[in-house]
Amino acid sequence: MNQYPAERIARARVLVVGDVMLDRYWFGEVDRISPEAPVPVVRVARREDRLGGAANVARNVAALGAQVTLIGVVGADEVGHRIERMAAEEGVRTDLVSDTEHPTTLKMRVLGRQQQLLRVDFEQHPEPAALDGISAAVARQLAQHDIVVLSDYAKGVLDRVESIIAAAVGHSLPVLVDPKGDHYERYRGATLVTPNRAEMREAVGRWKTEDELAERAQRLRLDLDLEALLVTRSEQGMTLFTDAGRDHADAAAHEVYDVSGAGDTVLATLAVMRAVGLSWGDAMRWANRAGGIVVGKLGTSVVTAAELAGEST
């Protein structure tokens, strides 16, 4: 694989649109069981916040050295303000829509001895007025970017994804989608869709052989008018389907510690590498390496340009 294209990446402009959320971690020690119920008592010693969902995709793009703008919905609350501050600190430009009726999506995890004990989610779908704001923000930003990434976590921001794809295609911009659910018709006309193994099974059913997977993947790709379809397959690596056929990269992870946000890292790396003109195959291999690095980290994390460049030497 070629040398890390740092200079070209610095000029790349990536627009990320999707479900923005905050991942909040409470770390502590467990030394007893509650007398109120048979559950562990965690003495919280440290709290850490990380950008999640589409915001994690954006921070991964920034960590690789590219320019990035994030569009999403936040509430008029502490969590929303925290996301805006953290995004700025990580080099992510934002064009966020404020929904005063609903809270910002928050995923709170409680960990003891580095093991996750509990996750609590706070979320509601945005109001139609907020979705109007998303459409307006996309219209403002498209002309200033080279590629569009849609990060769908089924929280409602991409309920009008068809119109966003159409607008991007109207500006001759590639559209990369991390999908959710089994209604893939919504993503028709995008450039690439990146389902994981479970999502692919949900969309096309189970397969028994690689040939059967290839047949179903190519049929789905052609039905949706996609240029490429990438199936991420955990320990089996990732498989790319295009007009040229099937291409595969074996898993690159040295040690799997936490898979949270790994798909975000893969999507961000694909977008950056395609924005600078790399082929689908080369972009997939860079993304595979990035995914292999990030699963060795705890929680939603990023892969830096230095880490990825080091892996290529």
Swiss-Prot record:
CDD domains recorded: RfaE_like
Top enzyme category: transferase
GO BP, sorted A to Z: ADP-L-glycero-beta-D-manno-heptose biosynthetic process; lipopolysaccharide core region biosynthetic process
Binding site for ATP: 196-199
GO molecular function, one term: heptose-1-phosphate adenylyltransferase activity
Pathways per UniProt: Nucleotide-sugar biosynthesis; ADP-L-glycero-beta-D-manno-heptose biosynthesis; ADP-L-glycero-beta-D-manno-heptose from D-glycero-beta-D-manno-heptose 7-phosphate: step 1/4; Bacterial outer membrane biogenesis; LPS core biosynthesis
EC id: 2.7.1.167
Entry-linked SUPFAM superfamilies: Ribokinase-like
Catalytic activity, reaction form: D-glycero-beta-D-manno-heptose 7-phosphate + ATP = D-glycero-beta-D-manno-heptose 1,7-bisphosphate + ADP + H(+)
A Gene Ontology term for the protein's cellular component: cytosol
Pfam families hit by this protein: PfkB
Domain of life the protein comes from: Bacteria
Coiled coil: none
UniProt cross-references to InterPro entries, sorted A to Z: Carboh/pur_kinase_PfkB_CS, PfkB_dom, RfaE_dom_I, Ribokinase-like
Active site, UniProt feature: 264
Sorted UniProt keywords: ATP-binding, Carbohydrate metabolism, Kinase, Lipopolysaccharide biosynthesis, Nucleotide-binding, Transferase
Recorded family membership: Belongs to the carbohydrate kinase PfkB family.
NCBIfam families (UniProt xref): rfaE_dom_I
Name of protein: D-beta-D-heptose 7-phosphate kinase
